[in-house]
C-alpha cells in the first residue's frame, strides 16, 4: 500500500520466491481498489499459456488469499482473456503481454492498477520480441488521457522472482546499471526511486 501512495506510476518489486509479493499486491487491489473504491484491477502474465493456467484451482493467484480469508475469488476464461469474479461480480481482468494487440480498443476507465506478475522471464524461457514496447503500449491503452483529465496515472506494479538485471523491462526503463549497483552493495531491502520509477529489491 505504501508504495502505491507514492503516486509513482512504474513500481518494480523483485525478490525471492515465497516473500508474499503477489499475495500482498492482489490483496491490496481487492481491499483498496475493489471493496473501498468500487474499481477493478488488471492482472497480467507474459504469455497466454501462463494466463490460462491461472484459471485452474491449483494456479489461481487468489488461492491462498481465498483460503486465508474465506473469499471466493475465481478467474474465468472469456474471449481470449480472463476475468476475475467475486461470486457473480466481475472485479478484474487478466491479460497476457503477448495478447496486447488484441485489446488495444479496450476501455479500462474503471481500472487503476495493472499487476504484472513474473515480469522477468525465467532463464529457460524464450525472449519476446518487442516485450518492453508491448508493455508500454498496454500501459497507454489503460492509462489513456487520465492525467489530462485531472486523474492520477494508472499504477503499473511489476513483480518478479528472477533477478536478471539485464531483463527487457530494465533495459527499456534504463535501470540495468542501477539494479546492478544495488545488488553489488548487497544490502536488502534496497530501493531506488525518481518521479516515474520505483525499484525495490528484497
Model-inferred region functions:
Residues 1-202:
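Phosphate/NTP-binding elements of NTP-utilizing enzymes
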Amino acid at each position: 500500500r505504501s508504495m502505491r501512495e507514492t503516486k509513482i506510476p512504474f513500481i518494480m518489486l523483485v525478490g525471492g520466491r515465497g516473500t508474499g509479493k503477489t499475495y500482498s499486491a492482489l490483496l491490496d487491489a481487492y481491499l483498496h481498489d475493489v471493496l473501498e473504491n468500487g474499481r477493478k484491477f488488471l492482472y497480467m502474465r507474459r504469455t497466454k499459456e501462463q494466463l490460462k493456467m491461472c484459471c485452474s484451482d491449483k494456479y489461481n493467484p487468489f488461492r491462498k488469499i481465498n483460503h486465508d480469508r474465506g473469499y471466493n475469488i475465481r478467474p474465468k476464461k472469456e474471449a481470449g482473456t480472463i476475468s476475475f469474479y467475486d461470486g457473480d461480480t466481475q472485479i478484474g481482468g487478466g491479460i497476457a503481454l503477448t495478447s496486447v494487440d488484441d485489446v488495444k480498443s479496450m476501455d479500462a476507465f474503471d481500472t487503476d492498477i495493472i499487476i504484472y506478475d513474473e515480469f522477468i522471464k525465467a532463464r529457460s524461457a524464450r525472449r519476446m520480441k518487442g516485450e518492453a514496447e508491448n508493455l508500454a503500449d498496454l500501459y497507454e491503452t489503460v492509462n489513456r488521457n487520465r492525467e489530462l483529465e485531472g486523474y492520477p496515472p494508472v499504477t503499473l506494479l511489476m513483480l518478479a522472482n528472477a533477478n536478471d538485471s539485464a531483463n527487457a523491462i530494465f533495459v527499456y526503463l534504463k535501470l540495468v546499471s542501477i539494479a546492478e549497483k544495488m545488488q553489488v552493495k548487497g544490502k536488502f531491502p534496497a530501493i531506488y526511486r525518481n518521479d516515474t520509477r520505483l525499484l525495490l529489491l528484497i
